[in-house]
Amino acid sequence: MKKYYATILYFLFCDVLYYYLAYNHRLWSITPTPPLTSEFVALIGEFIVFAGTILLFLGRYPPNQFFSIRWTGLWVILYTANEWVLLKTGTFVYEHGWTLVHSFIFNIFMFIFLRLHDQRPILTMILSLPIPFILIKLFSIPIR
């Protein structure tokens, strides 16, 4: 876990930044069933699901480029399929024009950036800087 600590922090920071910037104008949100709260589900997601994803995704990342593309594609499909199930069960909600297609594209970037951060963290942070501004502009997110 120590090897991927910085990448886990990068991921958590990006997710928390989304929740902060889009607090009153969320593009997607979780609507858990009682007795679970949104905060509890978010914490479980942050510290168990997302951290576990990074450990599995990067920990078993194949050295071969052909297999690495397939590995990344598998994770994009897993995350998108999971989101589709959550969407169909009403646990996940889209707002303000966000769709499953947007999530699919977002997942592609997310997994590419996770791998890139593992290899070149400074470059990844520089490349990540415009993403919130692009999303703010595309989806008319009011700045807090």
Where are these regions (language model features)?
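Aromatic-rich, lipid-facing transmembrane alpha helices and their immediate juxtamembrane interface loops
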Residues: 1-144
